[in-house]
Amino acid sequence: MSLSLWQHCLARLQDELPATEFSMWIRPLQAELSDNTLALYAPNRFVLDWVREKYINNINALLVDFCGSDVPSLRFEVGNKPVSARTTESVPKTVTHPAVNSTPTNSQPVRPSWDNQPQSQLPELNYRSNVNPKHKFDNFVEGKSNQLARAAARQVADNPGGAYNPLFLYGGTGLGKTHLLHAVGNSIMERKANAKVVYMHSERFVQDMVKALQNNAIEDFKRYYRSVDALLIDDIQFFANKERSQEEFFHTFNALLEGNQQIILTSDRYPKEINGVEDRLKSRFGWGLTVAIEPPELETRVAILMKKADENQIQLPDEVAFFIAKRLRSNVRELEGALNRVIANANFTGRAITIDFVREALRDLLALQEKLVTIDNIQKTVAEYYKIKVADLLSKRRSRSVARPRQMAMALAKELTNHSLPEIGDAFGGRDHTTVLHACRKIEQLREESHDIKEDFSNLIRTLSS
């Protein structure tokens, strides 16, 4: 049996799995084949458990394909494989980081002179970390829409600077990106009390740089930002058209990466779609791992409501949670805001929380949602997005240029309205409910396999929910 067995498995897995999944879970594995046993080494327990749960059947099937009856046994371990085996079985890297000119500094954090505060008033470490202690992994509600993002953030928290660097999270407003940033920061500081973790909105970075320039303290600014263990920046798209800020962040990024210091960035869009940001920065954003967070599906929305109610020590009936979740779909923030309103009204009036009570408490919000998202609106939005006519969506045409948008519109109608499958079918030229069901399943499958379809779905959800 050749020592290249794992390389053959890798090639097949790369073809079979979505690129994000392969990069996140399979690429970090190291392999050693010895005494008819294939040992797979994972960087941490989290990756090991995930691979064993999600991909062991894929791996075993490939071993049977390649080895026939002489299938090696499979063993999982945490750590690195023996040094003697690394030259032949290490997982190949596909990203090579160009050399950079910035020289990282390992000096202690310095007082930013642009803040004009006496040194004695500042903590020695972690000053102005801005990490919110309330946002942790334990109270982040996981679902299919955010599962990969949470898993990636968890790995980074367990191995900052060594797992995925940078980690780039993108998605619409209110989907949990900021929560994950804080969760990573909290986790790192729990493991290492004096860790130098800084969270900020991108506009704060710009403001700090402007103050540093005004106070002739740009060198202090550089030393401060290049001395952190983890830099967590929210809404990186606000760097757009700020050339000096981009220039400074470019060199800060390079210095941190060379020093194996963790960088996590968030944006409301895919890196290459951020207008007004230099190509060299957008390229670097993709050096590590880029993961999308999508609007939560029904089950996750219900779980979020139940979790929030539990935190407020409120008994929320299941049917009420489903009623709210079916009608408010755009983001987590909207869900939590609606529940806060329901709880406040219940406290003020002393009434029990029922569907009728919720319908009354949220009547303006529910009326707005029903007005905004209709099948007609979905059809018009999808037709405009794909540059076809609404009549094409209703026609019998089956060419891919029409069939795929039609399937997308049907899937969106199921996701964003309360219409039944037969009602959706009727609205699309009198189609059978099984056609609608097939369309929904097809789009769900394609969202897993195709970055373009995933982006189209997310973009249309944002447009229809805004």
From Swiss-Prot:
GO terms for molecular function: ATP binding; ATP hydrolysis activity; DNA replication origin binding; lipid binding. Residues 130-346 are annotated as: Domain III, AAA+ region. Its main location: cytoplasm. Gene3D superfamilies: 1.10.1750.10, 1.10.8.60, 3.30.300.180, P-loop containing nucleotide triphosphate hydrolases. InterPro entries: AAA+_ATPase, Chromosome_initiator_DnaA, Chromosome_initiator_DnaA-like, Chromosome_initiator_DnaA_CS, DnaA_C, DnaA_dom, DnaA_N_dom, DnaA_N_sf. GO terms for cellular component: cytoplasm; plasma membrane. ATP binds at residues 174, 176-178. Pfam families: Bac_DnaA, Bac_DnaA_C, DnaA_N, Hda_lid. Residues 1-85 are annotated as: Domain I, interacts with DnaA modulators. Residues 85-122 have a biased composition (Polar residues). Residues 347-466 are annotated as: Domain IV, binds dsDNA. Residues 82-122 are annotated as: Disordered. The keyword Nucleotide-binding applies. GO terms for biological process: DNA replication initiation; regulation of DNA replication. Keywords: ATP-binding, Cytoplasm, DNA replication, DNA-binding, Lipid-binding, Nucleotide-binding. Residues 85-129 are annotated as: Domain II. It is found in: Cytoplasm. Oligomerizes as a right-handed, spiral filament on DNA at oriC. Belongs to the DnaA family. Domain I is involved in oligomerization and binding regulators, domain II is flexibile and of varying length in different bacteria, domain III forms the AAA+ region, while domain IV binds dsDNA. NCBIfam families: DnaA. Plays an essential role in the initiation and regulation of chromosomal replication. ATP-DnaA binds to the origin of replication (oriC) to initiate formation of the DNA replication initiation complex once per cell cycle. Binds the DnaA box (a 9 base pair repeat at the origin) and separates the double-stranded (ds)DNA. Forms a right-handed helical filament on oriC DNA; dsDNA binds to the exterior of the filament while single-stranded (ss)DNA is stabiized in the filament's interior. This is Chromosomal replication initiator protein DnaA. The lineage of its organism: Bacteria, Pseudomonadati, Pseudomonadota, Gammaproteobacteria, Enterobacterales.
